Amino acid sequence: MRVKITLACGECKQRNYNTMKNKKNDPDRLEMRKYCRFCQKHTMHKETK
């Protein structure tokens, strides 16, 4: 089952990315290194509600 999730920057808490994930394969909260245009650098982005 695929669900929509939002990724928020770990430093400035801005919600920068929307994506989909498969809950069966990834039951935990997703964490990725992505570019934050507000911080103007690559930071850890965490899944939010």
Swiss-Prot record:
Q: Which Pfam families match?
A: Ribosomal_L33
- Give the GO molecular function terms: structural constituent of ribosome
Q: Has UniProt tagged this entry with the keyword Cell wall biogenesis/degradation?
A: no
Q: Which UniProt keywords apply?
A: Ribonucleoprotein, Ribosomal protein
Q: Name one GO biological process term.
A: translation
Among SUPFAM superfamilies, the record links this protein to: Zn-binding ribosomal proteins (SSF57829)
Ribosomal protein in keyword set: yes
Q: Name one GO cellular component term.
A: cytoplasm
Top-rank taxon: Bacteria
Enumerate the InterPro entries for this protein.
Ribosomal_bL33, Ribosomal_bL33_CS, Ribosomal_bL33_sf, Ribosomal_zn-bd
Fetch the NCBIfam families from UniProt. PRK00504.1, PRK00595.1, rpmG_bact
User: What family does this chain come from, according to its entry?
Assistant: Belongs to the bacterial ribosomal protein bL33 family.
Protein known as: Large ribosomal subunit protein bL33
Q: Which organism is it from?
A: Acetivibrio thermocellus (strain ATCC 27405 / DSM 1237 / JCM 9322 / NBRC 103400 / NCIMB 10682 / NRRL B-4536 / VPI 7372)
